[in-house]
Amino acid sequence: MAKITYTDIDAYHASFPEEVQERMQTIRGIVHKIAPDAEEVISYSIPAFKIGKHFLIYYSAYAKHISLSSPWSAALLAKFEVELTAYKVSKSAIQLPLDKDLPVKFIEQIVKFRKQEVVAAT
């Protein structure tokens, strides 16, 4: 099976069912609200946002979840330790199940925290 190469975030979104597209569009809107200077890119064949040379956050959709991805810092994992217990989490991804409401406030908090980290690194 050939790997699909997307040219932009709209093309990525269009390859998923409408309900998933809406969730991804919500995440995209959150990022733009919190980090209006972030640049939209496709990296590793998934949507991502950069501030300068640094990646703010990635997201990707799967059959049963949407992943928020980044190399999560120890500080971020510690700050959101309690909230993260509700999700499957790895060193680089937080899985948001499609059968549950999208945790908008939590996503906003993560993006704000990541923005602080990225700005501090520049």
Question: Which positions does each model-derived feature cover?
Answer:
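Charge-dense, helix-prone N-terminal extensions
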Residues: 1-122
